[in-house]
């Protein structure tokens, strides 16, 4: 039996053993209205217990991640052999038991359409990526976005690419660490598309090509339900009164600083995607389980639930990529370093054929850098809430 400290090291160290200031050139728009408050309405993406009731056979396919309380493992070939209803039962059970993280190995060689079929086993609305550049999508399968550094025969990128910064080093051991460093603003822990109302329910990321062992390219995940539960009761009560103002334009402006090929929003796109405010502590509508939420490059301010952001400040956040001091004080200096401790994190080292599914409302994740002499190609799908399949212009990088 491993000690708790040994388990923490295993979770932070890898998973191969477990699974063999730029501003847009366009003139500023007319002042935008204050951000809309995300409604957190009850949704039906998670099917009722009756429609996905597990059986002994399906439950036997769900196993713990070794040395971790976070995540579950489902064998890929066994999952593919099941009919749709049983696939859904297995994946839904694994998501619930795994705190929103599921690892599915041994799927090398599946087609993009098979990935879409698996995505429909997670939820009923798989998005078709409206607005994403066609070269970043699988031809004739618009649900699948390509992420990585792969190029076409002309040498042009055929994948959405964002360069992850180096990992910080532990101040005691000197080893790379996943714990967020407020000074370096690294790793780039985030939840996807917090600027949407409602945010997407889940994401699937499938490994087509991966750098060899030791060359980087891992993806790490953190359990925001466990982190929320570990907070002091009084602090949780204070956080329930706060909201994160999330802006799509602000997000793209910040990512563009690090990766100039990342697209900025046009004035029309900005007008079509106004900011929203999200609760810092988000309650699951089905179980009432609470999770920390809102860690995203889209967050430009943290406000009391009774306050609003002025249109002038929104222009500054969206057009100049600036953020209010409240973001650093709460999200970067306090919550992220706490929530990305080893006891809450899992690091996945990819093998070709691996699939990872995560609940976007209960987890955060981060990419890690890799040796760009090697190809890295990932396929990604996004599962929306049935009420939230609205247009957006791209996915963040895993």
Model-derived segments and spans:
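Fe(II)/2-oxoglutarate oxygenase catalytic core
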Residues: 57-99, 103-357, 361-398
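Generic alpha-helix initiation/capping and coil-helix boundary signal
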Residues: 13-14, 112
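N-terminal chloroplast transit peptides
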Residues: 1-2, 17-38
